């Protein structure tokens, strides 16, 4: 199955505490989760690791968000959009369903 959301796509969050925020997908996991730049920031308590020269303390980092909770952002319409697939010149391409433009 082809992925509707891929790395480096600009997405908008549909639900949750970050609803309405936009960001770029940095990583896509096979279990249906994505990491989005600047979205779903959590605070982790990390222990110091003297052997690696790592200081401990509170570290803010991005957590994964369910792929169903984000939608690809269409810059032409300035809205969230759905993704479709079609074949052009023998290649499978993704397109925005609202204006049939290739992503």
UniProtKB/Swiss-Prot annotation:
A molecular function GO annotation: rRNA binding
GO CC, sorted alphabetically, is:
ribonucleoprotein complex; ribosome
Which Pfam families does this UniProt record tie to the protein?
A: KOW (PF00467), ribosomal_L24 (PF17136)
* Top-level taxon of origin: Bacteria
Q: Name one GO biological process term.
A: translation
Q: Which UniProt keywords apply?
A: Ribonucleoprotein, Ribosomal protein, RNA-binding, rRNA-binding
Residue stretches spanning the membrane: none
Q: Does the keyword rRNA-binding apply?
A: yes
On subunit structure and binding partners, the annotation says: Part of the 50S ribosomal subunit.
Cross-referenced NCBIfam families: rplX_bact (TIGR01079)
Q: Which family does it belong to?
A: Belongs to the universal ribosomal protein uL24 family.
Q: Per its database record, what is this protein's job?
A: One of two assembly initiator proteins, it binds directly to the 5'-end of the 23S rRNA, where it nucleates assembly of the 50S subunit. One of the proteins that surrounds the polypeptide exit tunnel on the outside of the subunit.
Q: Which HAMAP family match?
A: Ribosomal_uL24_B
Name of the protein in question: Large ribosomal subunit protein uL24
Q: Which organism is this entry from?
A: Haemophilus influenzae (strain PittEE)
């Amino acid at each position: 199955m082809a992925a509707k959301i891929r790395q480096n796509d600009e997405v908008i969050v549909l639900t949750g505490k970050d609803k309405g925020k936009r960001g770029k997908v940095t990583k896509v996991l096979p279990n249906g989760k994505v990491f989005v730049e600047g979205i779903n920031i959590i605070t982790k308590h990390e222990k110091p690791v003297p052997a690696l020269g790592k200081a401990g303390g509170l570290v803010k980092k991005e957590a994964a968000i369910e792929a169903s909770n984000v939608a690809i952002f269409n810059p032409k319409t300035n809205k969230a959009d759905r993704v479709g697939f079609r074949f052009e010149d023998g290649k499978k391409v993704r397109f925005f369903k609202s204006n049939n433009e290739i992503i």
